[in-house]
């Protein structure tokens, strides 16, 4: 976890610099145009700008999300099992390898860009990107083996949601590798596959369920061992979120395979069935969140909820805040 924090912090700093610089350039041209000053757009190389922008923005997904999530898996697995992480040295090495990988994979966003050099598409966009299947696959494997070696384990909320997070990334990462193939990208580029099968499942299932696991690990520490109001609601939340999140991404991905573009309006009902099914699954995720929120509020009570935002009467409990 400490290595993951260090790794993620490096990419956070770099990402902030790159995106800030890219954004300032846009604002310069925007305000100049509003002020009646016409700047020469050709003075900025469009291809260089796109590479600069995607190098920075890609650090968010390929550097920050994957690394912070992997670090969270390791921490959660050791807390849940009470045992040392399996292959701890390899886990550290994989996190550091991802540092280099995340800096060199941005071209997978430019595989359909005609101006992007073909060699950069092949090496950065396809070959180096494939290493993320190795680095994240190692993180998933190490976490699962750590849990396996500690069996029998009680299927607690934190364990269930951790497994749900592993399932999410176990589906989303290969979906991303598939679309990072130069041939498959011809079919999948800018379609609902990208935002559905890859992004939605990674974030809604992989990231969110990992965070829910962390919530249940922290629950007794931040509530003075308050009892969860309803375990049945916690179970309902789990299944609705898992099935709804995977279903939403899957149906969007199926529409993408049939050619449905993202950021595009369709008026003739070509993809209505898949979008309706994706919408139903999305509603399941929303309902799951409402159930989770209701269960949390009922567990701490309205007085406890309001008390979160009030100063503590115990001076020691708020020391340093």
Task: Locate each region found by the language model.
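Juxtamembrane membrane-water interface segments that cap and precede transmembrane helices
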Residues: 43-55, 188-193
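Membrane-interface helix termini and inter-helical loops of multi-pass transporters
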Residues: 113-118, 185-189, 262-265
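Cytosolic-side membrane-entry/anchor segment at the start of a transmembrane helix
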Residues: 152-153, 159
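Hydrophobic cores of alpha-helical transmembrane segments in multi-pass integral membrane proteins
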Residues: 1-2, 11-40, 54-81, 88-111, ...
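Catalytic-face loop-and-helix region of soluble metabolic enzyme cores
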Residues: 226
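Glycine/proline-enriched, intrinsically flexible loops and inter-domain linkers
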Residues: 118-119, 140
């Amino acid at each position: 976890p400490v290595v993951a924090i260090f790794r993620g912090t490096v990419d956070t700093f770099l990402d902030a610099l790159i995106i800030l610089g890219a954004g300032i350039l846009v604002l310069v041209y925007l305000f100049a145009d509003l002020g009646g000053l016409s700047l020469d757009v050709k003075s900025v190389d469009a291809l260089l700008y796109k590479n600069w922008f995607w190098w920075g923005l890609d650090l968010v997904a390929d550097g920050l999300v994957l690394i912070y999530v992997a670090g969270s898996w390791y921490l959660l697995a050791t807390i849940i099992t009470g045992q040392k992480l399996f292959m701890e040295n390899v886990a550290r090495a994989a996190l550091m390898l991802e540092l280099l990988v995340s800096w060199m994979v941005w071209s997978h966003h430019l595989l359909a860009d005609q101006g992007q050099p073909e060699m950069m598409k092949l090496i950065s966009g396809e070959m180096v990107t494939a290493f993320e299947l190795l680095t994240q696959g190692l993180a998933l494997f190490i976490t699962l083996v750590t849990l396996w070696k500690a069996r029998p384990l009680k299927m607690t909320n934190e364990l269930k949601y951790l497994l749900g997070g592993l399932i999410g990334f176990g589906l989303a990462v290969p979906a991303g590798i598939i679309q990072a193939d130069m041939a498959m990208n011809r079919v999948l580029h800018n379609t609902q596959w990208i935002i559905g099968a890859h992004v939605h499942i990674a974030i809604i299932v992989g990231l969110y369920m990992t965070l829910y696991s962390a919530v249940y690990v922290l629950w007794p520490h931040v509530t003075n061992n308050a009892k969860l109001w309803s375990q049945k609601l916690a179970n309902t939340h789990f299944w609705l979120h898992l099935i709804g999140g995977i279903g939403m991404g899957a149906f969007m991905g199926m529409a993408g395979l049939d050619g449905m573009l993202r950021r595009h309006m369709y008026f003739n009902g070509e993809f209505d069935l898949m979008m309706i099914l994706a919408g139903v699954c999305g509603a399941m995720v929303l309902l799951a969140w409402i159930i989770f929120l209701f269960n949390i509020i009922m567990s701490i009570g309205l007085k406890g909820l309001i008390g979160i935002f009030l100063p503590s009467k115990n001076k020691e409990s708020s020391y340093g805040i």
